[in-house]
Design a protein with these regions (language model features):
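Active-site neighborhood of thiol-dependent amide/isopeptide-bond enzymes
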Residues: 161-174, 342-396, 400
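Bacterial N-terminal signal peptides
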Residues: 1-3
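N-terminal propeptides/low-complexity segments immediately following signal peptides
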Residues: 10-57
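Secondary-structure boundary elements
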Residues: 99-106, 114-155, 295-362
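Sec/Tat signal peptide C-region and signal peptidase I cleavage site
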Residues: 5-9
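The feature marks a conserved, polyanion-engaging helical scaffold used by nucleic-acid processing enzymes
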Residues: 231-338
């Protein structure tokens, strides 16, 4: 049985309001949540059952591309790094150079509740939450990072600065910083080590999670620990339900991030249609471990407007004067024949839907990637309504003609 999702142009007003409110209300957030947070950490942690989220689609995809029966017929430059400040470091974040305060912290003495609480107190005594939290938020605002990019920024920053520390120290540090940038990210014990509890705003497929008072938290381990899934139950704390515990991690790119560009020229062609465009290859590095989320969320994201404008403007000229049916057929032919076909397992070794920019960078994709690209072209070139339709082992795009 399939599922259909309506694709439409996104509206960034809600995102801008959310981001502005998040930043403007940070001081009240600290007063409500962070004051006394160590007291909650010191409470007796409870056991929670771990669940495994569903896979997006367990049926294997076809090893060859489905046959096509055709119908007859600008990103702003990334801001430069902030002016040099004493005791700051320069961080390479997927090709974008960022300036952040150097981190000097004592190691976590133990991974139990009191050890984590003591770690928080030591960081608070340095004023680290305000200083570093504000620096991270300023970068996210200036570079238009979404919540998932903030999650990755904190991971990259802590891994760089605490490379020789224990995995538990890095996890505790990441949780502290994410709390101080406005998110309800928590920490838990699992099989002798610490894990982050990340509250996503949408389903994350093929992940371990727990439910705390009706709120789903995805478990995230330190990359150097070798852990990717939970073993047995998880121990963590509760926050009083009436408190503003912080925001969720929204992985959707509501606005295009301002990242350093490493432009490559690509040519997409079939026997009749050819388009040339430039795409930022740095996006492939950034998005390599992007989480598996519902396909409709990919269609709501904006990554590199200049690439999409360049691509769609050429196709708008190519299809000018065509009937809707002929225009749709022309773009379908291009999407089906401009790329080599490979399943995600063959290309990456794991399930990975591609944004249109990634399809252009890799030059290889599968049915779901082509459906995402095709639906974007339909919306932006013709303005026609379309649906992403999911079948077991296959994804298609239905167009209203």
């Amino acid at each position: 049985m399939g599922a259909a999702f309506h694709c439409h142009a996104q509206d960034n007003d809600d995102f801008e309001s959310f981001r502005s409110g998040l930043m403007d209300g940070f001081q009240s957030f600290r007063q409500e949540v962070l004051t006394g947070y160590t007291d909650f950490l010191r409470t007796a942690w409870e056991d929670f059952n771990v669940f495994r989220s569903e896979s997006r689609d367990s049926k294997p995809k076809p090893r060859t591309a489905p046959a096509n029966h055709p119908t007859p017929a600008a990103t702003p430059p990334a801001p430069g790094p902030a002016p040099a400040v004493h005791n700051n470091i320069t961080l390479d974040f997927y090709g974008t150079r960022l300036m952040l305060p150097a981190l000097k912290v004592a190691a976590l003495r133990s991974s139990d509740n009191n050890g984590v609480a003591d770690f928080w107190q030591a960081l608070d005594s340095q004023g680290l939450g305000s200083k570093t939290g504000n620096a991270l938020k300023e970068i996210a605002e200036r570079h238009r990072f979404n919540d998932w990019m903030m999650l990755k920024l904190v991971e990259t920053y802590v891994s760089n600065q605490l490379a020789t520390a224990s995995a538990d120290t890095r996890i505790a540090m990441r949780q502290y910083l994410l709390c101080h940038t406005g998110y309800d990210v928590r920490v838990a014990q699992n099989d002798g080590c610490l894990a982050l509890l990340v509250p996503y705003s949408t389903t994350i497929y093929s992940s371990s999670y727990i439910d705390v008072d009706g709120k789903r938290f995805t478990l995230v381990f330190d990359a150097k620990s070798g852990r990717t899934t939970a073993c047995g139950s998880v121990r963590t704390y509760r926050l009083p339900g009436e408190r503003n515990a912080g925001g969720l991690i929204d992985p959707v790119f509501r606005q295009a991030p301002r990242v350093t560009e490493s432009m490559v020229s690509v040519k997409l062609t079939d026997k009749k249609t050819s388009v040339a465009c430039n795409v930022n290859a740095n996006l492939a590095k950034l998005l390599y471990d992007y989480p598996q989320i519902p396909l409709i969320e990919y269609s709501r994201s904006s990554l590199q407007p200049s690439f999409r404008k360049e691509l769609t403007s050429q196709l708008r000229q190519t299809t000018a004067g065509m009937t809707p049916e002929a225009a749709v057929g022309t773009m379908l032919n291009l999407v089906q024949h401009a790329f080599k076909y490979a399943t995600d397992q063959e290309q990456f070794g794991f399930e990975k839907p591609l944004f249109p920019e990634e399809s252009a960078i890799y030059g290889i994709n599968d049915c779901e990637d082509r459906a995402l690209l095709f639906s974007m072209l339909i919306r932006q070139v013709t303005g026609l309504d379309c649906l992403l339709v999911e079948y077991p082992g296959h994804v298609a795009c239905a167009v209203r003609l």
